[in-house]
Amino acid sequence: REREHRRRVAEAEAQRIRELKALAKRESETWTEIFALIEQMQAKPYAEAVRLLVKLRDLAEYQGEEAVFQQRLNRIYEQYSRRSALLRRLREAGLQQS
């Protein structure tokens, strides 16, 4: 039973790493998509932008590039400082400005 649990955890982690590596190949396009979603100024696109930002944060952590990600996130906070709904969603997702 414990062995099965460990196997499932290892499989899940391997899948997560595969997904992060796939995301790394399209990181630039993902940032472009995020800004396009934000520009729509609607709830669903904001939610999708935040979902993608969380994935990019995970990728940055995996690659040891947290500082670079944080700089880009800070720019979003600055560039869209008047979009309270977006900023609230970012904070709720744990994407804090620093």
Identify the residue ranges that each predicted region occupies:
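C-terminal structured domains
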Residues: 1-98
